[in-house]
Amino acid sequence: VIGGGIIGVFAAYYLAKRGLSVTVVEKGRIGAEQSSRNWGWCRQQNRDARELPMATRSLELWEQFAADSGEDTGFRRCGLLYLSNDGDEIARWAKWRDFARTAGVTTHMLSGREASERGRDTGRAWKGGVFSPSDGTADPAKAAPSVAAALMKLGGIVQQNCAARGIELEGGRVSGVVTEAGTIKTRTVVFAGGAWASSFCRQLGIRFPQATVRQSIVRVSGVTEHLPDALHTARVSITRRSDGSYNLAISGRGRVDPTAQLLRFAPQFLPMFAKRWRNVFPGGLEGIRAGHETLARWRLDTPTPMERVRILDPKPDAAAVKQTYNRAVELVPALGKTGISNAWAGFVDNTPDGVPGIGELPEIPGFILAAGFSGHGFGIGPGAGHLIADLVTGDEPIFDPAPYNPVRFKQSAWGKVADF
């Protein structure tokens, strides 16, 4: 398994549970990129229809993992609260509620009175909202390392600070993984490399359309009031961390850095950017400096871009940090008592339709891709990992894998952009 984020470690864990010999190679540290830089939401609410089965099973698997492994990911079903004064937005939530009922998902539409009561910490009235009681959060700082620890209990191997440089083939099929520490012989590789997926696939002659969006999160500490565990509004969202601090973020807001890879795939991403133009802004040179979107090719016997940049750690967007904090304090004044503790950013790997690509690539038997989770992969990590293990072993899939098959990006230039 190449990549030690939440997708990679869960895939490795479920493979090890089936008795396979599993090694995870991670160029930096387990969970150090987007898997530890997200909100931590584990949700069914407002999921795109294609992802809902994965989201539903993932909630069950988060709980089952803790019971089976004894490891703590910080997962809890605290419920997610959405509030709005926009009639159109509330109508969209009601439409999603009607769809979700057909899938057996429970979600509660809130009247103005109910929304205002649940959102009383904001000190304002709301027209409506929605509460999803079975959804929850996990701790991004704990989750991937906890799963890696469980994997090692099962006999799996985790190699950190060990970059995978490429793949060896025999007769057109995977025969090994070349790492900076040597070659690992194997007939099956799972690539769960996040923002590095497209450039890695390019080395294999595979076109995987991917664009990264640089998003920022703000953290505040010392809040004595017990605010909602997870609250979303159109202007800002807040999430309570396991240590009592709060993460603040603006949903979908980010910067797109102009890179050669972005220009290469720009036509396929036009529908997505057109749908989200209000929150996506032109970026700068961060993407070029990071090197994960390079179009260059590299040799397997010399250091690669992954060894030069062990962990993608972009600077947070100063304007976004200021705007996020100001909006959060305006929404919940109690968040403004102590100021900003810290802020960080991450590169979110997106596909043109906002749905991940998971499946074996027909060009290279034995190579299974799992990437492009588009900023909402953390919560569905367990389900994705279980599905990957099913595909590797040939077991009956835990849910239909067809919507995630990466072959779709070759069959159609433009797919339906996901609803979030």
Region locations from a protein language model:
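Short beta-strand to alpha-helix junction loop
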Residues: 53-56, 82-92, 130-150, 159, ...
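Glycine-rich phosphate/pyrophosphate-binding beta-alpha loops
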Residues: 39-41, 47, 135-137, 256, ...
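Helical element adjacent to the flavin cofactor pocket in flavoenzyme catalytic cores
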Residues: 130-188, 195-199
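Flavin-dependent oxidoreductases
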Residues: 10, 167-295, 307-318, 323-336, ...
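Glycine-rich FAD pyrophosphate-binding loop
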Residues: 16-36
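Dinucleotide-binding Rossmann-like beta1-alpha1 core, especially the glycine-rich loop
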Residues: 40-114, 118, 235-238, 243-283, ...
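Glycine-rich Rossmann-fold phosphate-binding loop(s) that bind the pyrophosphate
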Residues: 3-5, 27, 193
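C-terminal lid/capping helical subdomain adjacent to the catalytic/cofactor pocket in oxidative enzymes
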Residues: 7-10, 18, 109, 114, ...
